[in-house]
Amino acid sequence: MSNIQNMSLEDIMGERFGRYSKYIIQERALPDIRDGLKPVQRRILYSMNKDGNTFEKGYRKSAKSVGNIMGNFHPHGDFSIYDAMVRMSQDWKNREILVEMHGNNGSMDGDPPAAMRYTEARLSEIAGYLLQDIEKNTVSFAWNFDDTEKEPTVLPAAFPNLLVNGSSGISAGYATDIPPHNLSEVIDAVVYMIDHPKASLEKLMEFLPGPDFPTGGIIQGADEIKKAYETGKGRVVVRSRTEIEELKGGKQQIIVTEIPYEVNKAVLVKKIDDVRVNNKVPGIVEVRDESDRTGLRIAIELKKEADSQTILNYLLKYTDLQVNYNFNMVAIDHFTPRQVGLQKILSSYISHRKDIIIERSKFDKAKAEKRLHIVEGLIRVLSILDEIIALIRSSDNKADAKENLKVSYDFSEEQAEAIVTLQLYRLTNTDIVTLQNEENDLRDLITTLSAIIGDEATMYNVMKRELREVKKKFANPRLSELQAESQIIEIDTASLIAEEETFVSVTRGGYLKRTSPRSFNASSLEEVGKRDDDELIFVKQAKTTEHLLLFTTLGNVIYRPIHELTDLRWKDIGEHLSQTISNFATEEEILYADIVTSFDQGLYVAVTQNGFIKRFDRKELSPWRTYKSKSTKYVKLKDDKDRVVTLSPVIMEDLLLVTKNGYALRFSSQEVPIQGLKSAGVKGINLKNDDSLASAFAVTSNSFFVLTQRGSLKRMAVDDIPQTSRANRGLLVLRELKTKPHRVFLAGGVQSDTSAEQFDLFTDIPEEETNQQMLEVISKTGQTYEIALETLSLSERTSNGSFISDTISDQEVLVARTR
C-alpha cells in the first residue's frame, strides 16, 4: 500500500501530457536540424543499410524491410513505416529520393501505393551518403525501444538533407514546412559559409536564391524568400508553368506542364473542369489530363472566340494552378524545437560535419596506428626470421609461443598474435616490400589524420572537398524558376461573362429567374410560373453582362449579376430570394426592380410611409462583398411598422405625395437632398398623427387618379395641386365624411401625354399594343374590375369621385394596380 500515491487529476494530466508532447515533438513529427530526418525516416534508412538493402544490390520486398524496421526500431505500426518509406521514394515529393522503389508507389493524382507485399525497395545511391562513415563511431547511438539493439540518434549526412529535401509535419504546438532546394546551390552556400562563417544573408542568397521544388513551377516573391531565410517564416507564390498553344481553325488551348508543389493533379483537373461545367468562365471546351511517362501535361481547350489570357488569369486565381507556399522552418536543435533561418541551418550543419569528420579521423587514426604497430612487428620479424621460427618450433603451443615472443624479443600482445598467425607465404621478398610500403603509407595517413584533427583549416578543406564530390556526382539543373515580384492577377470580370440575350422576371413575393428568348417567346405573358398569391411586377429583356437591383419594402436592396440568375423556363416559378439572402424577411416584398449596365451614374428617390424622402446615388450600390448572401440598406426606416411606399429613378422635376387621409403635396425633386444609404432621409410631407403616406409618384402627365379603400375613383388635374415646398401639409383631395370616410388606397399619374415606360414607377412589364392605361381593382370578395383611366372625366379637388361598382363600397378594395 506504500506504493499508492494520492495526486490530483490536474497534476497527473498536465505532467503526462507534457511527457507525451515532448515525445512527439522530439521523436515523431519534426526533423533534426543536422540530418534533416524525422526519427521514422532515420530508422528506415539505418535499418535498410544495416540489412545490406543498398543501391548496388538487388531490390527486396518492402514488407521485409518494414517488418525489420518495426521489429527492431519503430514499434508504431507497419502503415506509418511504409507510408514514410513510400514518401521518400516519390520524386514529386522529394528533390532527391532516398529510397528507390519498384512497383506502384503512388502518383501525383493522390493514388495510394500498392500494398507493401507487392512493392520492392532499396536505398538510393545518394542515401548512402547520409549513412557514410556511420560505422566509424561518428554519431552517438541509443538503445531501441526494448533495449535489444542500438540505433543512431543522427546520421552523418554527407550533404545538407534538411534543405535539399525539405520537411513537413505537425506536432503538439509546433508545425514545420521547409521547402526542398537544389543540391548544387545548397552545397555552394555551405562551402561559402565554411570560408566565411559570418557571411551575410544577402551573400548566401547569391548561391542559394530560393527553393527548388521537384514539380518545378514558378516561385514569385524574392522579398518573402529573404524574410523566410532570415526569420524562418514567409510566404511565396508558386505558379504553374503554362503556355498558350495554337490549334487548327483559330482555336487555342492552355497547356500546363508544371504544377505547384504538393498540389494533387487529379483534384486540380477536376476543379478546372468544374469551372467549365458551372460556366464560371466562358470559353472552355474541354479539360484533359494528357500526362504520361514523358511528363505532366494538362490541356485546357478553348473556344475560338475565347480570351485565353483572361481564362488563364481566372484559373490561376480561383484554382490551384497558383498557390501560396508558407515557410515555417522549425527543426529540432539540441533537443529543442526552434524556428530557424538559413544561416542557422547552414552553421548547424557545418558544426555537425565538423564533429563527424573529426570523429571519423580519430577512428581511422586509431585503426591506422594499430595496424602500423602490427606492421612494425612483422618487419622486425623478417630481420630475425630464423630465430623466430626456431623459438616457435620449440614452444609447446600457441599461447606458449606468444609468451616466448613477448619475453625474448619484447613484442607486444598484438604483435605476438600477428606473428603466430602469420601464413608462411607472407615471408617472401615481395611481401617484405609490401609491408615496408604499407608502413610508409600508414605513417603518411596518420600524419594527415593528425592534421585534420589538430588543424581546423585542414579539416574544413576536407569538408569542402567531400561536399564538392557529392555535388559533382549528383548535381542536376534547377527545376523551379524564380521571379522577384509576385504578379497581381487582374481579371476583367465583364470579359468572363458570355454576353447573351435573356428575359428577367421578378415577382412581388421575391421569386426571380432569367429565361431564354426561345422559352419566353414560346409562351404568353400570362403563362409565367408563379404562386397563385403572388404578382409579377417586372419583366424585361436584358443582357447577361448587365446587373439587377431589387429594392424591397423594408428598405433593403439586393444585387444580382444577371448571369448568376438561375436560367429557367418561363413557366417555372423561379428561385426565391430567401434561398440565398439570409436576411430576407418573411413580410418583405419587392417594391421596384431595375436593370443597369453600370453603376457610374443615376439617382433614385425613396419615400416611406412616415413621410420621409431622400435621393441616393447609384454609385453607392456597387456590388458589396457579401452580396450573394446578404442585402444592404438603401434607406433607414423610422420604426418596425414603417415601409417604403415608392422607389423610383429620378426622372422628372416634380414629385407628388398623397397621404392616406387625402392630403396631396407637390414639390420639386431638387428640394430632396442626396444622402447616403444609411440615412432615413428628410421630411417630405407634414403628416398628422393618424395619417401615413399612401402613394408617391413623379409628375409625368397632366392628371392623376385617386382610388379609395371603398372603391371610389376619380381623376383630377395636376394643376389643382400647385407646386409648393417640401415638408408642408398639402391640400385635401377628398371630402371628409363623418360615417364611412374615404381613405386613399392608391394614387398615380394618368398616362395621356407620355409613354408607359416613362410613367411606370412600379413595373416594367411589357405593355400590349394599346394606348389605354388600365386600373385593375380586386375586392376583398374576389371580384375584379378594370377601368380605363383616360376615360374618366376630371373631377374637382374636393370631390370623393364615383364608385367603380354599385357593390364595391360594401366589399372594400384588396388589391389595385395599373397596367
UniProtKB/Swiss-Prot annotation:
GO terms for molecular function: ATP binding; DNA binding; DNA negative supercoiling activity. The record marks 38, 74, 76, 87, 93 as: Interaction with DNA. Residues 30-496 form the Topo IIA-type catalytic domain. Keywords: Cell membrane, DNA-binding, Isomerase, Membrane, Topoisomerase. The keyword Transport does not apply. One of its GO terms (biological process) is DNA topological change. It catalyses: ATP-dependent breakage, passage and rejoining of double-stranded DNA. The record marks 117 as: Transition state stabilizer. Belongs to the type II topoisomerase GyrA/ParC subunit family. ParC type 2 subfamily. This is DNA topoisomerase 4 subunit A. The gene is parC.
